[in-house]
Amino acid sequence: FARKSGCYNLTLNVWSCNPSAIKFYESCGLRPQKVHLEALLSADGPGAGSAEAAPMIRLARPDDLPALGPVYGVARRFMAEHGNPTQWSDRYPLPEDLEADLQRGELYVFDQDGVIHGAFVLRLGEEPSYRSIEGAWRSGAPYGTIHRVAGDGTVHGLFAACMDFCKRRMSHLRIDTHENNAVMRHLIARHGFL
């Protein structure tokens, strides 16, 4: 957001997609400026020099695995509190699941100043569980599959960042969720999945 007043140009960096926050800043005379994710994540982008950098998406490393247990714990509790207590079991994903994702180079994390705030899996190529489905896929083109999206609840916009990241790597994406996961179903639909 930026507001020009006399000789001064005030710039306030706000990393929010919250409509209420945006309306508040607009009511103060500030105007929104759309910034692409690449610019936010680059070293010299709009957030450079700010006190808090935007979360960076990167491949997970072995030393990230201990931080993922609590992240997935928050996600399991969130799902249970929002009408979906059965999609992920008490300990899902298991540490060995995450280790296998890491070894295949499919596990990504949201890293903000060395703190892991979320994770997801992007699997490029055929997904065995999609070989037999009810209905039909709209395209038989090569695709990537998104699995195990989770955040710790402290950073907003992780799902949108995940989608942008995945779309830059594969033009055809597939994702699924449990029928009781209303929050994820809403997010998936909002990002153009049918």
Predicted feature residues:
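C-terminal "cap" of GNAT-fold acetyltransferases
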Residues: 5-56, 143
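Conserved GNAT acetyl-CoA-binding A-motif
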Residues: 5-13, 168-179
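Conserved active-site alpha-helix within GNAT-family acetyltransferase domains
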Residues: 16-34, 160, 179-194
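A short beta-loop-alpha structural element at the N-terminal edge
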Residues: 56-70
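Conserved GNAT-fold acetyl-CoA-binding loop/helix
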Residues: 76-96
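Conserved beta-strand in the GNAT
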Residues: 109, 115-125
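Conserved acyl-donor/pantetheine-binding loop and adjacent beta-alpha core of acyl/acetyltransferases
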Residues: 121-154
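Conserved acetyl-CoA pyrophosphate-binding loop and the N-cap/start of the following alpha-helix
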Residues: 153-165
